[in-house]
Amino acid sequence: MEGLINGSVYYKIFDKTFNNSSHRYIKKNNSINETEIVENKKSITTYFKAQDILILNQVHGNQIVNADESIIAVPEADGSITTKKNLILAVQSADCVPVLLASGDGKIIGAAHAGWKGSINNIISNIVTKITEKGAKNLIAVIGPAIAQSSYEVDDEYYKAFLSKDINNKQFFIHSIKENHYMFDLPAFVELKLKEAGVKDIKNIAEDTYTNPLKYPSKRRSYHLQEPYNQNILSAIVMK
């Protein structure tokens, strides 16, 4: 457990080295049973000595859930914010960029799943706006482990989509050895979006999920190796 704001806000990246979980947190198919999910969530709440945990049904979008409001079903969203103590906010990832946020006074927290679709469609500015509207100031952010530029090859259509949003996005791409393909720096893009939104205090873990198979699940690595993709990193934050 890392102290983001000692005495009030803590976070942890639950990777493969955390042995008290099978690293499955949402039931998306019949290969995952409900008991397994319940036990995995319980292991996280026990670790933090917290009361509850909110894990979203992520859809690679830009919607943010206010977890202060009553939530009955698992929300379809890619970010959450709260002022509640002992409520863990968590996002799953396996190459996409997890972002954890806290106000400088330790009274508001947030978590976002920033894949390329969510990132290009302003999920970072959305969550910063939402958390600021609740009174957060002097935001602190953690960028969790994600796929690095050296591991992330994309095609020309993807490249053009980013440049159509802003020609300056060209800085995040370098040519691949494969014709009409590029290597994209998604974590750097997310970091810039945090800075543009006014976040100055940013901790970037800067570890490549693709090249660390013993520590991190990677959807792209699993695809390339023709292996099942059935685990996720869980990036979690809580106020005490």
UniProtKB/Swiss-Prot annotation:
Keyword Hydrolase appears in the UniProt entry: yes
CDD domains assigned to the protein according to its UniProt record, in alphabetical order: YfiH
EC number of this enzyme: 2.4.2.1, 3.5.4.4, 2.4.2.28
Domain of life: Bacteria
Gene3D superfamilies, alphabetized: CNF1/YfiH-like putative cysteine hydrolases
Catalytic activity: adenosine + phosphate = alpha-D-ribose 1-phosphate + adenine; S-methyl-5'-thioadenosine + phosphate = 5-(methylsulfanyl)-alpha-D-ribose 1-phosphate + adenine; inosine + phosphate = alpha-D-ribose 1-phosphate + hypoxanthine; adenosine + H2O + H(+) = inosine + NH4(+)
Cofactor: Cu(2+); Zn(2+)
Example GO molecular function: oxidoreductase activity
Keywords (A to Z) from UniProt: Copper, Hydrolase, Metal-binding, Oxidoreductase, Transferase, Zinc
Protein's job: Purine nucleoside enzyme that catalyzes the phosphorolysis of adenosine and inosine nucleosides, yielding D-ribose 1-phosphate and the respective free bases, adenine and hypoxanthine. Also catalyzes the phosphorolysis of S-methyl-5'-thioadenosine into adenine and S-methyl-5-thio-alpha-D-ribose 1-phosphate. Also has adenosine deaminase activity.
Quaternary structure and interacting proteins, as annotated: Homodimer.
Membership in a protein family: Belongs to the purine nucleoside phosphorylase YfiH/LACC1 family.
Protein name: Purine nucleoside phosphorylase RC0672
Originating species: Rickettsia conorii (strain ATCC VR-613 / Malish 7)
